[in-house]
Each structure stands twice: as C-alpha cells, then as structure tokens.
Regions:
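Active-site nucleophile loop of the alpha/beta-hydrolase fold
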Residues: 209-219
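N-terminal cap/lid segment of alpha/beta-hydrolase-fold proteins
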Residues: 23-60
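Alpha/beta-hydrolase active-site loop
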Residues: 150-168
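N-terminal cap/lid subdomain of alpha/beta-hydrolase-fold enzymes
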Residues: 2-8, 50-149
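Glycine-rich nucleophile elbow surrounding the catalytic serine of serine-hydrolase chemistry
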Residues: 182-192
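Residue in the alpha/beta-hydrolase core beta-strand immediately N-terminal to the catalytic nucleophile
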Residues: 179, 207-209
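Conserved small/polar residues in nucleotide/adenosyl-binding loops
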Residues: 242-243
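Alpha/beta-hydrolase fold nucleophile elbow
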Residues: 173-184
Length: 244
C-alpha cells in the first residue's frame, strides 16, 4: 500500500511518491443529492530541509460540481486515544458510509458487519478529511525519523497542523471555511492544533467541534470524589438530548 521507505541499491532508505486511490460516488444525504470524490491516500509532511519526515494517511470526501463562486467548507476530523486512528468517527459517525453493528455498542456483536449509506453524515454541508495521526492506521514516520518523534502533545499537534497546511495548499483550499472536529483526547489535540495554526502558520479557523470533550481530564470526570465541576461540563450535552 505504501509508496514510501523502500530500499535503494546502496541500502539507504528510498522514499517514493505518496500513494493515493481516487473514486467517484453519488448519494443522498439529509435529503440532498451529493456527487463527491473519495480520496484515500498518503500526504507527506516535511522537515525544514524539505525532506519527508512522516506520511499521514487520510480519507477525504469532497463535493463535485460546485456552483460558481461556491466556497465549500472543509472539516478535519480525528479520534482520540492518543493512539486511535480515525476509523470510529469515519465508519461509525460522520463518513458517507458506516459499518452496521448488530448490538447496542457495548459489544460489536457477531459478523458479518454490512456497510450501508450513512444519511446522517455532514457531507451535505462540508467536505470531510479523516486523519490518522502518525503511528495509527497507515500513518508512520519516514526516513531517519521515528514514531516517538511525533508522540507527545506538542509533537502530535505540530504534525497535524503541518498536515492541514500541506493539504489546503495542495488542494487550493486556503480560502475555504475551515473547521476542526475531535473526539475525547482529540479535543485536547484540536485545541493544541488550533493554537499552532492560528499563531504559527497563519491559518484562520472558522470553528472547532468537541465531541466527548477531554480538555481537562481531571476536572471533567465524575469518577473523582466530590468533583462537582464534571457535572457542569455535562450540561450542554444534557440540554441537547432533551431538546433533540
């Protein structure tokens, strides 16, 4: 699958061009017909010398046949962990297709697990880019770099921010409305990535979505004795449940 890290005749590491797979699709989401392109593949992030230091594997869904002067939003999505690929939000929540799990989600149940259209996806209102951080999914370090070079809060956020700037440059999306969407530890990552994008890379964000926020692990858990703050953090979700 990877187009990276093969061996040159002299025994050195040979980094090839990124591998990508592109297909065209059409479906109806939230009552709207959407023709879209699915791109599964690698994007290289580079060091200060311009050499690839890691490949991040992503699944991107972008709408086709845009109206004249239409500026389509793009949302960058990841799970948490740290150590989780984006499979769960991709195939279980926000992607255009989902895996059907014949259970109440406490256990996956027994196979087979069919794949069906996901009418609740948000692809009707925004393009979607599901990102696997370095060391998860098919994403990995390249050349002389190692996974541990990317496995810290700051290092992780820097690699994700570098990916976003690379992606919007390669795809001509600097002027698109841009959003981050993270889950659990992914909310911590989103806050860190947003700071780097805004302060260091001159990328302005239109919004951030926190799912199962974990910005403060100690303060947001009800399992710490007498921690009343945790219940306050649940109020927005409880309100949403009662009004939906």
């Amino acid at each position: 699958l990877h187009g990276a890290d093969e061996t040159a005749p002299d025994g050195a590491s040979l980094i090839l061009e990124p591998t990508r797979f592109i297909s065209e699709h059409s479906s109806r989401f939230n009552g709207q017909r959407v023709d879209y392109t699915a791109t599964a593949g690698e994007t290289y992030i580079r060091d200060l010398e311009g050499e690839p230091k890691a490949t991040l594997f992503t699944f991107a869904y972008t709408k086709n046949n845009l109206a004249e002067n239409e500026l389509r939003p793009v949302t960058f999505i990841w799970n948490g962990g740290p150590g989780s690929a984006s499979t769960w939000l991709h195939m279980g929540s926000y992607g255009p297709k989902r895996v059907v799990v014949p259970s109440d989600a406490q256990h996956a149940g027994l196979p087979p697990y069919p794949i069906e259209e996901a009418p609740e996806t948000i692809l009707d209102v925004t393009d979607l880019v599901f990102i696997d951080p370095v060391g998860t999914g098919f994403s990995r370090a390249l050349g002389d770099y190692e996974g541990k070079d990317f496995w810290g809060l700051d290092e992780d956020a820097q690699s994700m921010a570098n990916f976003i700037t690379t992606w919007i440059t390669e795809n001509g999306r600097w002027n698109s409305p841009k959003f981050l969407l993270g889950e659990s530890f992914g909310t911590t990552r989103a806050a860190a990535v947003a700071r780097i994008l805004e302060e260091d890379l001159s990328v302005s964000l239109n919004g951030i979505v926190f799912i199962s926020q974990a910005l403060d692990y100690q303060g947001s858990t009800p399992y710490v004795r007498d921690n009343l703050i945790s219940f306050i953090t649940y109020v927005p979700t409880i309100c949403l449940l009662y009004t939906s």
